[in-house]
Amino acid sequence: AGEAHLEKLLGQAMRDPDRPEELTPEQARILGHVEQAMRAEFIFKRNKDYLVQAGKVIIVDEFTGRLMPGRRWSDGLHQAVEAKEGVTVQQDNVTYATITLQNYFRLYSKLAGMTGTALTEAEEFDKIYSLAVVAIPTNLEYQALRADSGLMEMEYKEDGQKFFYFARKEDPQTPALWRRKDFPDVVYRTEEAKLRALVMQILQRHCLGQPLLVGTTSVETSERVSDRLRADALQRLAQVMLIRAAWFEKNNRAEDGMAVPELQPLDAPLDKLSRNDLAKWLRDLGLSTNPAGEENLARLARVLGLPESAQTRLMEALQSGIKHNVLNAKKHDEESRIIADAGALGAVTIATNMAGRGVDIKLGGELAEEVLTAVNRVLRKAGHADPYDLTNEQRKAELLQIPESEQGIYQAECRLFLEEMEGAGRVKEAGGLHVVGSERHEARRIDNQLRGRAARQGDPGSSQFYLSLEDELMRRFGGQGVSDLMQ
């Protein structure tokens, strides 16, 4: 049917009726162009697979989330995408020879490598390259599990899940070093339900002062999550939360995750919900229409499980939105600044795979090099032999012993250093960096790399993935059948 429609459009036959299995070179060329045009139109998505910048189509690496300027898809696909986007169609690349990565690596007599996610691909390394994968203990485990370390591993439970930390043998109840808390995935039937739960998690932890890194699979998704953190979207979500909580309370029912026909109108996409309709729901339940009002604020805090001390941050978030940074291929030139702030108290960073590997997020925020240099000079002047070998905690302890009057021209830098260290302490008390994944990747190692941004070098930290049966990966592998069962 597709070829018949194409023949009608072009006014020429695409195959010889007597020998349909054979194609002329011209017919093969036209069918190839048509196939690439269909791929460009229906499979390759703007702000996911590529960006359009300065009149050019630039590929986005699906594994790293970074731009690949100068790279072009082959066989006319790049030209088809250029035609789709209305930019100048450039000459196609000519390929003289190709080789697979597997065969390329086999050209070497010696082959070795190192990565933090090799174990997930151990079978492939053995099968294709005859390479064994050896797991090297992390620095934390090496230090903690030595016989002379004075540390012991302790188990505890949180939300029904088992987690571990290292404590000194003389004080086993006080954690000295942490292992990351990987919470189980949460799966929702619709993307809308997932987005709401994701934003509620961000709002809750932001109000507690815990920094968050929200991982997304595309530029488009990162911008969609960013839109949900604006004040108007948060207020609308808060109204829905208030209505649901009040309805269940009024009808003496517990919220068990099952669909409630009476509340089904609230399941529509958030931007489609009428403010007037939400206001009517609230008034009928005897509530104020202002989600930031005193009574509503206290009710929202209970729904989110927040202490009274967090209500001020909750009110600020509802009134002004949640201040956050977005790191994607469009903002690659701001990467260092965004990453430097990602571990600050209450910071929220929404990022594509760019933040999933090779990124070290410091709790409390990154200390400027000039601040550390100034502190080291003060310590050296005070008689410390080599302050550059100290950890920041040790620098803090030493600096507190030096009066401000002896800090000379570096008083401001020393004060800033102590403030940053105090902020880092508060972040650790809040639970460290929490990583939230908005979708699973096709390659498990990319998910592991994202999780690995939290709880580095014994710092506290946690991770969790929020999924829906409408996610691309779920749709590809039978999510519709599970969705029908959930209904």
Q: What feature does the model see in each segment?
A:
Residues 1-487:
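Conserved P-loop NTPase motor core
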